[in-house]
Amino acid sequence: MQTTYRKLAKNKKIALVAHDHCKQDLIQWCQTNRTLLQPHILYATGTTGNLIHQETNLEIKNLLSGPMGGDQQLGGLIAEGKIDLLIFFWDPMNAVPHDPDVKALMRIATVWNIPVAMNIATADFLISSPAFQQETEIRIPDYQGYLKERLK
């Protein structure tokens, strides 16, 4: 597949997601990094977003809770180029009923080549990267080229 580039603005659109056993870790991470997160546009699945807002007072655009379709909503936003970065603290020790949705979310984040952090260490690396604080580009699939090729 051919590729093209997409600009990520200085103020990123960041998705925040956490499984139940990881919510407190994500809330604490957001609290620790509140100043760095504040200028960005933050999205979250329902329960996680409400808890983060309550504890940090960060403005969050809440979607549905993950099991109710929030993971799929995020996947749609990623495919539309409306999410630049995904912070997803997931619990590798416990299966969740919506595991297929989680797998689909991770797949679509990989297809569209957005940075993804699945643990605190990686989230710390992302947020401390110079690219986090400035405009940058990522390589993405050339969907128009893909479509043109398929419609020949």
Swiss-Prot record:
InterPro entries the record matches: Methylgl_synth, Methylglyoxal_synth_AS, MGS-like_dom, MGS-like_dom_sf
SUPFAM superfamilies referenced in this protein's UniProt entry, alphabetically: Methylglyoxal synthase-like (SSF52335)
SMART domains cross-referenced by the UniProt entry: MGS
The keyword Lyase is annotated on this UniProt entry: yes
Keyword Kinase carried by entry: no
EC number of the protein: 4.2.3.3
Domain MGS-like: 6-152
Entries under PROSITE patterns matching the protein: METHYLGLYOXAL_SYNTH (PS01335), MGS (PS51855)
Record GO terms (molecular function): methylglyoxal synthase activity
One GO CC term on file: cytosol
Residue positions of the active site: 71 (proton donor/acceptor)
Catalytic activity reported: dihydroxyacetone phosphate = methylglyoxal + phosphate
Enzyme class, broadest EC rank: lyase
Biological processes per GO annotation: methylglyoxal biosynthetic process
Binding site for substrate: 19, 23, 45-48, 65-66, 98
Keywords: Lyase
Role of this protein: Catalyzes the formation of methylglyoxal from dihydroxyacetone phosphate.
NCBIfam families: MGSA (TIGR00160), PRK05234.1 (NF003559)
HAMAP family associated with the record: Methylglyoxal_synth (MF_00549)
Family classification: Belongs to the methylglyoxal synthase family.
Protein name as it appears in the record: Methylglyoxal synthase
Species of provenance: Histophilus somni (strain 2336) (Haemophilus somnus)
Lineage: Bacteria, Pseudomonadati, Pseudomonadota, Gammaproteobacteria, Pasteurellales
